[in-house]
Amino acid sequence: MKIAVLSRNSRLYSTRRLMEAAQSRGHQIRVVDPLRCYMNIATSNPEIHYKGQKLEAFDAVIPRIGASITFYGTAVLRQFEMLGTYPLNESQGISRSRDKLRSMQLLSREGVGMPATGFAHSPDDTDDLMQLVGGSPVVIKLLEGTQGIGVVLAETRKAASSVIQALRGLKAHFLVQEFIEEAGGADIRCLVVGGKVVAAMKRQGKEGEFRSNLHRGGSASLVRITPKERATAVKAAKVLGLNVCGVDILRANSGPVIMEVNSSPGLEGIETATGKDVAGMIIEFIERNRKPGKTGTKGRRG
């Protein structure tokens, strides 16, 4: 197969591992910077051009699109879909996962466990919003934040009101969620490939830090997940329409609750913690499932 990896940096661990896994199985693989792609949309024969030349045809495309380039990156991916290239994750699924509010609405509708979550516009509704999620302490989360950036723990109602007021002044959109204290600053990252959890790790925030992201100094270790946690991760991936994703789960007293679904999960932490060849599993999934033009969207739906 000829495989394209949409990535801005070929030296990143995840990109390198995917290339190694594909090449070891005899596939041709090329890293394509999505921001250097430009598209011919007006004709009946859609094209993608790259650094001054028409891009050759690929059998499959692996999107490793950073959150900061979601809009343009998914536009490029849609163009690949229109050309009949098999996408590991479709543009629609990535767009859903990157919209924290939309993804929470979809997960809630399908009965997936999640923390009490509120969203409001008017400052007059702040007190009621706090009550909706059970009162302080609360977690206030920017909709466009990643890797723990833009996430604040407000331990009192006064602190929460101050943070909310400041964010409204910046015209920022945010969610207010209940704080799952019993999680103890830890979460479970489940790596889903093709409707199965193929690896899982526990991420523990450093002392005094409620965020468990490895980018925030957290540590990772192998963990045994429960059948309910496994089912929750698989269902979340299915609801958002993702073949491959990282599902972040908190262990609440009420059971597993979803914090986030990452459509471009990093591989370094989970491969190191579990010793599993996740990159190889991803390439094997493409081998089993790739068919020309096999995409639910074909670029037609947003």
Swiss-Prot record:
Mn(2+) 1 binds at residues 248, 260. InterPro entries: ATP-grasp (IPR011761), ATP-grasp_RimK-type (IPR013651), ATP_grasp_subdomain_1 (IPR013815), RimK (IPR023533), Rimk_N (IPR041107), Rp_bS6_RimK/Lys_biosynth_LsyX (IPR004666). The keyword Lipid biosynthesis does not apply. Residues 104-287 form the ATP-grasp domain. One of its GO terms (molecular function) is ATP binding. Its cofactor is Mg(2+); Mn(2+). Its EC number is 6.3.2.-. GO terms for biological process: protein modification process; SOS response; translation. Mn(2+) 2 binds at residues 260, 262. One of its GO terms (cellular component) is cytoplasm. It comes from the Bacteria. Keywords: ATP-binding, Ligase, Magnesium, Manganese, Metal-binding, Nucleotide-binding, Protein biosynthesis. Belongs to the RimK family. This is Probable alpha-L-glutamate ligase. It comes from Halorhodospira halophila (strain DSM 244 / SL1). The gene is rimK.
